[in-house]
Amino acid sequence: MERASLLAAPLGQTEVFQALQRLHMTVFSQSISPCGKFLAAGNNYGQIAIFSLSAALSSEAKEESKKPVVTFQAHDGPVYSMVSTERHLLSAGDGEVKAWLWAEILKKGCKELWCRQPPYRTSLEVPEINALLLIPKENSLILAGGDCLLHTMDLETGTFTRALRGHTDYIHCLALRERSPEVLSGGEDGAVRLWDLRAAKEVQTIEVYKHEECSRPHNGRWIGCLATDSDWMVCGGGPALTLWHLRSSTPTTIFPMRAPQKHVTFYQDLVLTAAGNSCRVDVFTNLGYRAFSLTF
């Protein structure tokens, strides 16, 4: 009897610890696999969890279908941002970007392929990298975060080629308008800034918090998440999660979510996923109906 109770104690402690972890968890980043069947989500504990979207969206889905297929430790600190290439999952934390093979991720003991650090003013400066953005036509990666700059990295050579300045406070998020081509960035200064990549300069600014229907002064003005399909943009953070028409710079839909959101993703104009200050990833279909939530 004593032996049984001794064996049970650690198990109970583990369950309590995991429950406390979920209670204090923030999902900072998401990325959908190239095949569209899996969703990677990164949290404040440095973990990346891989969910099966095909299983969760199935008509026969059970609660277990909404749990991670695999979870692994990717960074010592929070996983602030992630993005997927045809073969790799790229993740970023405090001052570093790592690459993982999608083909190996579902296996236990997945190891990083490489790690890169942007050039900073001093060796003591290690600002967080809040956002990653792929520019396929240039085969490059844009990184942005705590130093208020947009850094461009050549994915073939691993070298950093330019830095764009404009934000007055640190940057939280990035998105690409492929037709333009323009990059959108959102930051602590409350602005969404549009950058022309060919001219390497800022061409438009939308100060979201100045629109009454979006403004939530008690949450602040910061823009924490951003996504676009070229004609439309979704952004949120301090202001409410809102769908915008970019050409007219007008808000059209306010999503019914109270908590500030840290990440939002479009997928083929059909699915919108949003995550923030909880262990949940909310999934919307038809850009308005909340279908279900995934949980760590």
Model-derived segments and their meaning:
Residues 20-46:
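Beta-strand-rich domains and repeat architectures in extracellular enzymes and scaffolds
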Residues 42-45, 92-96, 102, 137, ...:
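Conserved strand-to-loop turn within each blade of WD40 beta-propeller repeats
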Residues 17-22, 60-64, 68-74, 109-124, ...:
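Short C-terminal beta-strands that terminate individual repeats in beta-propeller domains
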Residues 24-31, 76-83, 118-134, 169-176, ...:
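Canonical WD40 repeat/beta-propeller blade segments in eukaryotic WD-repeat proteins
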Residues 48-52, 97-103, 150-154, 192-197, ...:
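WD40-repeat beta-propellers
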Residues 52-60, 101-109, 197-201, 286-293:
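Short loop/turn segments immediately following beta-strands, especially the blade-tip
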Residues 36-40, 87-90, 138-142, 161-162, ...:
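Structural hallmark of WD40 beta-propellers
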Residues 2-11, 15-17, 28, 87, ...:
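Terminal intrinsically disordered, low-complexity extensions flanking WD-repeat/beta-propeller proteins
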